[in-house]
């Protein structure tokens, strides 16, 4: 079989080698390797290429009818032969991304304890808080460079899934590798089990997590601090990604640690970056700048406020003052428009609250303006949904917006798809085909009035793999706001609509390899400019990015004794 790159020296043999997913090649072990590693007779006699293996695996994959069974099958391959898994995934990325991640990963999280087959990553329980250093040493991977960690409290739009939240770090890191070329040998999913408040899980005899309510806030803060300090001791320079933490913890954790360790929150910053990139592409379709648009958010949690903050950063880069940018952003929560007179606002919400004194000319009947009131009075150009509440974008809301704006930009971003604020077909119908639409979950093309409308998916996979690749390639000490902004700009520049290649806002998923490299280059340049990484010339940076980009190809093995 053709093998690529330099030989890899392996101390394992026999069943131990076959049971090591990072090294197992299955039927692709050559005759010489089978003899050298005591594999003769342990495998069928035929020697196969990875292409032949992938063809068989794809045939088996297609035999499963339901998305969750396809997900289980792909995970089984991943736990047996990671190289084959990533070859299969990259060969069929657009088809399999919704299976390995959203929306199917949501079902996998809900069914985690029922479909559990084998362990992957680390599970760190609160009861083991004094053993974190030992647990990290138990990791099967020794050179970890990227960690995705969750506590399972806010899984997609599904709420508290307890230990089932582990499906998210596993799926997210699969995309770091498939889209960003980060070797699976350098990635580690981590589940912090601090209990669950989901009574259904606590009463489920199959539930595999700790059977107690979530711990108190002071205990939680101390536990997270112990974990982060232990991680940076074990793997200095590791990039730590927070994933699906609930609102009371998500933004405080990010603000507490972002200037201390190399970390970012994909729900806040990754979502913000991909959304801003898609907005920039949509604004180009209109021939406008983002700074010329008024934006309404439905949902004022950490994700919505994170997007709003990134929009403000882009608007100020285009020439507005921070105060001018703030006046063009309207946050709506379940009580109505977020205003400075509201009680109980968190710090990040207060920073985006509209001044009551600026709205004296508005007419509304309730204590605070409703979403429909805001649509009438603000006449926004952009409507973004991050509420997790299906159906909030009603026909009246959309039609009102379309009457005031020639080409409204409407992004119902909540996922999974059953929680989307409005379906794209309805948005186009109610706006009479005028809306530019992107969603958080995957939707197919929409036909309206004899015209086909492509529906972009604001999938964070457009952004975070490239950020990770860039951070690793220059060994950046931090992830900065400017790094996120240039990632957005790079995504917008890759828009087919911006390059005269149709109306699609975002490139096809099959083009993510080059996009990730382009984002990595832009991010790496900013890291150097901001003094977060040692300076290197552009050619060296591109060479590092290419060298760091792992490909799912087999290497020839030579045996070594230890």
Swiss-Prot record:
Residues involved in NAD(+) binding: 154, 267, 415
MF (Gene Ontology): malate dehydrogenase (decarboxylating) (NAD+) activity; metal ion binding; NAD binding; oxaloacetate decarboxylase activity
Cofactor note: Divalent metal cations. Prefers magnesium or manganese.
Site residues (Important for activity), renumbered to this chain: 267
Enzyme type, top EC level: oxidoreductase
Name the UniProt record assigns to this protein: NAD-dependent malic enzyme
Positions that bind a divalent metal cation: 243-244, 267
Xref: CDD domains: NAD_bind_1_malic_enz
SMART domains: malic, Malic_M
Cofactor: Mg(2+); Mn(2+)
